[in-house]
Amino acid sequence: MRPYLLLTPGPLTTSESVKTAMMTDWCTWDEDYNVHIVEEIRKGLVQLATRKTDEYTSILMQGSGTYCVEATLGSVITPKHKLLILSNGAYGDRMGNIAEYHEMNYDMLAFDETEQVSVEYVDDYLAHNAEITHVAVVHCETTTGILNPLKEIAHMVKMHGKKLIVDAMSSFGGVPLDVEELGIDFMISSANKCIQGVPGFGFIIARKSELQYCKGVSKSLSLDIYDQWDAMEKGHGKWRFTSPTHVVRAFKQAMDELAAEGGVEARHARYCRNHDVLVEGMRSLGFKTLLKDEVQSPVITSFLYPDKEFDFKEFYHQLKEKGFVIYPGKISQADTFRIGNIGDVFPEDFSRLIEAIKTVAK
């Protein structure tokens, strides 16, 4: 029995069957786990990411999505490289923090949190800064819910002959994309987002030809994506260090449920319906969205406080008592709160949410 729905961008509400999948113990040395679960996940992730499956591989890494972002940047960027980070929110900024810690040679182009990354500006920057070798960008910036124009960014980056690293943490599995068609070299995501698993590991979809250059680059033992991949390849799914077995098994169940739903296109359509029901209902109650509709993702939606007297903590706790957990805002330029549209939640859940907000907001 669910005490409440998590209307958050991850961790999120999971199905009962995903939770039940964690009720069995697994041996990390056994082929039932490594071959029939881990390797099936690795293969399935590549199939979700592209039709050109022979050109890409996947690496699973223990920890949160940020662990995978740091592992990727730390395994890809050498002292001979120069990284350009495109940021319009907290998660783009976090890549900058990682680059600082690793003393990488990098530049950052910062854009307003409520505006998409400007393709024209980045194009001009790359045209005048030939020393840039890699570009990193967040696809869906959950700071606000904005969806960056990945197709246009990727085309422009490839036109300039640069390598592309994409943080698709909150979009992969819920927003259609093909890494090969877009020319993405490394794409990063996490178990507890649109594929609707639980927290505990993330993953990288890597172009095989680029991954080979990562050997010996990382200065970290545990956050080395090449060594992790090499161990999984040679060990048929065996992780270098203890893997989160229950989380991995739950993720396999979540992937099966994604396929049963009809794949990424069908899930994207459900998330869009969730978002539409939410926004229509909230606007009918007088709430305003932070972002323009044309740049809004279906993943998470930011709403402005209705007035100066609005008490988010009180609003939050009253909604929680009615069975809904939402998210505080994360930007400095406006008072906002956020409601996630992803997870094992459906349009009828958002209709119930609107009814709850109608009583709470009186």
Curated annotation (Swiss-Prot):
One of its GO terms (molecular function) is 2-aminoethylphosphonate-pyruvate transaminase activity. One of its GO terms (biological process) is organic phosphonate catabolic process. It is an enzyme of class 2 (transferase). Keywords: Aminotransferase, Pyridoxal phosphate, Pyruvate, Transferase. Its EC number is 2.6.1.37. Its cofactor is pyridoxal 5'-phosphate. It comes from the Bacteria. It catalyses: (2-aminoethyl)phosphonate + pyruvate = phosphonoacetaldehyde + L-alanine. The modification N6-(pyridoxal phosphate)lysine is found at K193. Involved in phosphonate degradation. PANTHER family: 2-AMINOETHYLPHOSPHONATE--PYRUVATE TRANSAMINASE. Belongs to the class-V pyridoxal-phosphate-dependent aminotransferase family. PhnW subfamily. Homodimer. This is 2-aminoethylphosphonate--pyruvate transaminase.
